[in-house]
């Protein structure tokens, strides 16, 4: 696209006014790549809260007789975004389907955190090309974090011209308008906002199940770890107002939900953007303790922002679970500095000490990257020793995956792939060893299990999770699905526990 075409594109976008609100201030050419210089310009503009989401009359029964299909890649935030998009589709009159062959609209909600995730999406787009040939009226869309990357949008425009629409993470609430444009346009409709939008409340949702629910408490991230694309794809940190969060969770509790997971790219930064009140995650958790719901947990944490007040509140127990996922990424202070994690090995270990002192039965899990540019054998050994010192129950482990547009992608990488794979294998051996040994401690214990459904491996067996997020399998009546029960653990495996039902459903007070 040349400069003249770019200017024409901007003029076309700014002159097309479908609503009274002017969205042009948010929109920049999708051909502008993410960069630290631009992405770090966290403007001081006030983030507005909009609570009046609604659809104009033109969209009444817009999807009547049509079906939609959404495939989701990546984290819980993407899963929750899919729930919102499903809610919007349903409000438009569409019906869900689990078959791409039956769908009138197919959306791929994408993840940009690792190269493997992107490869899966482009592979799926290739498979959908033949379906589009057979059904030219099919609408295919790409949304989520990949859409925020200039190189991805270019690749879609050049090599995947059967894609009808592309939109990003900041304008999901604009789905009806984007969809309408895609249906009547001969060209691919691209609406990617490089500036994050306002916080939109009261969006419709179709939740997965009626036992556990995700609740966003904030959006975006301002940490700019050198390997991470999220600050570019999700924008600056924006917190929802506590009253809106509390209202949503009270509503879920009243509708029978047993467990809530609070979501954010960095939940520990919650409230730091408020200018009118001093209110953080610890304050929010303290208020949520008073709600009549069995369990509340949160993800994802950043050690830098995990403060003493939050630890003290979590120590009060009640419906606040004893499981904390605390990504460390590396056990080497030098590596952490290059990663721009803004804490040291010593700081992390001191944080763990405080957590264990206040919450003696706390279960800690983590994320670890191996093979970061220029990681030495000694630095990797520091990660191994930290894992042992903390005594994690388990970890999500990854070989470093460079993301275009991040500082780490420009670093010289002198760690051979065979060395990276060997380190990952050694780390996973340690993770598995600790996992099974930690689980063996549960043998003979009676634990509280929230029954979620049938086991994936055996429909005659029920499966659920403990407060510390341990998977438990046991034989019992399917009438217990959705209930809290007591189970005696009889066998420990690396990733799960087996047990026997010892008590009927518990009443949670």
UniProtKB/Swiss-Prot annotation:
SUPFAM superfamilies: Radical SAM enzymes. Residues 1-15 have a biased composition (Polar residues). Monomer. [4Fe-4S] cluster 2 binds at residues 221, 225, 228. It comes from the Bacteria. Its main location: cytoplasm. Transmembrane segments: none annotated. It comes from Bacillus mycoides (strain KBAB4) (Bacillus weihenstephanensis). [4Fe-4S] cluster 1 binds at residues 75, 111, 145. Residues 66-184 form the MTTase N-terminal domain. SMART domains: Elp3. Binds 2 [4Fe-4S] clusters. One cluster is coordinated with 3 cysteines and an exchangeable S-adenosyl-L-methionine. This is tRNA-2-methylthio-N(6)-dimethylallyladenosine synthase. Residues 207-437 form the Radical SAM core domain. It catalyses: N(6)-dimethylallyladenosine(37) in tRNA + (sulfur carrier)-SH + AH2 + 2 S-adenosyl-L-methionine = 2-methylsulfanyl-N(6)-dimethylallyladenosine(37) in tRNA + (sulfur carrier)-H + 5'-deoxyadenosine + L-methionine + A + S-adenosyl-L-homocysteine + 2 H(+). One of its GO terms (molecular function) is 4 iron, 4 sulfur cluster binding. GO terms for cellular component: cytosol. HAMAP family: tRNA_metthiotr_MiaB (MF_01864). Catalyzes the methylthiolation of N6-(dimethylallyl)adenosine (i(6)A), leading to the formation of 2-methylthio-N6-(dimethylallyl)adenosine (ms(2)i(6)A) at position 37 in tRNAs that read codons beginning with uridine. It is found in: Cytoplasm. Its EC number is 2.8.4.3. Belongs to the methylthiotransferase family. MiaB subfamily.
């Amino acid at each position: 696209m040349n400069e003249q075409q770019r200017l024409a594109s901007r003029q076309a976008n700014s002159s097309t006014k479908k609503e009274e609100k002017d969205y042009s201030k948010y929109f920049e050419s999708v051909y502008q790549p993410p960069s630290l210089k631009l992405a770090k310009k966290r403007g001081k503009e006030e983030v507005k809260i909009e609570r009046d989401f609604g659809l104009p009359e033109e969209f009444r029964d817009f999807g009547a007789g049509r079906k939609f299909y959404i495939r989701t890649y990546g984290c819980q935030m993407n899963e929750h975004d899919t729930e919102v998009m499903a809610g919007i589709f349903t409000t438009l009159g569409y019906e869900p389907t689990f078959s791409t062959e039956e769908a009138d609209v197919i959306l791929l909600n994408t993840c940009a955190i690792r190269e493997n995730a992107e490869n899966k999406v482009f592979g799926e787009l290739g498979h959908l090309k033949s379906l589009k040939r057979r059904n030219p009226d099919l609408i295919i869309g790409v949304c989520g974090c990949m859409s925020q990357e200039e190189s991805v949008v270019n690749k879609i425009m050049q090599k995947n011209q059967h894609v009808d629409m592309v939109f990003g993470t900041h304008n999901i609430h604009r789905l009806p308008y984007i969809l309408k444009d895609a249906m009547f346009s001969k060209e691919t409709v691209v609406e990617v906002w490089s500036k994050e939008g306002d916080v939109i409340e009261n969006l419709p949702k179709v939740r997965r199940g009626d036992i556990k629910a995700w609740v966003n408490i904030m959006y975006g991230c301002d940490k700019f770890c050198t390997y991470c694309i999220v600050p570019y794809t999700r924008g600056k940190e924006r917190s929802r107002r506590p009253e809106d969060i509390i209202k949503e969770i009270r509503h879920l509790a009243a509708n029978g939900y047993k467990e809530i997971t609070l979501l954010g790219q960095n939940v520990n930064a919650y409230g730091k953007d408020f200018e009118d009140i001093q209110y953080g995650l610890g304050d929010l958790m303290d208020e949520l303790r008073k709600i009549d719901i069995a369990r509340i947990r949160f993800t994802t944490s950043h050690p830098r922002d995990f403060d003493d007040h939050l630890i003290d509140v979590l120590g009060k127990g009640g419906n606040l679970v004893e499981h904390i996922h605390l990504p460390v990424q590396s056990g080497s202070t030098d590596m952490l500095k290059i990663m721009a994690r803004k804490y040291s090995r010593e700081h992390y270990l001191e944080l763990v000490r405080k957590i264990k002192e206040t919450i003696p039965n706390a279960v800690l899990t983590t994320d670890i990257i191996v093979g970061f540019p220029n990681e030495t054998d000694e630095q990797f050994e520091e990660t191994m020793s930290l894992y042992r010192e903390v005594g994690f129950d388990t970890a999500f482990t990854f070989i470093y995956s460079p993301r275009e547009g991040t500082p780490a992608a420009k670093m010289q990488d002198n760690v051979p792939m065979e060395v990276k794979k060997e380190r990952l294998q050694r780390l996973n051996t340690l993770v598995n060893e600790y996992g099974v040994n930690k689980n063996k401690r549960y043998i003979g214990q009676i634990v509280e299990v929230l029954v979620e459904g049938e086991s994936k491996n055996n429909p005659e067996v029920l499966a659920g999770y403990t407060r510390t997020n341990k998977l438990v399998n046991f034989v019992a009546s399917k009438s217990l699905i959705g209930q809290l029960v007591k189970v005696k653990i009889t066998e420990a495996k690396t990733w799960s526990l087996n047990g026997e039902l010892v008590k009927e459903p518990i009443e949670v007070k």
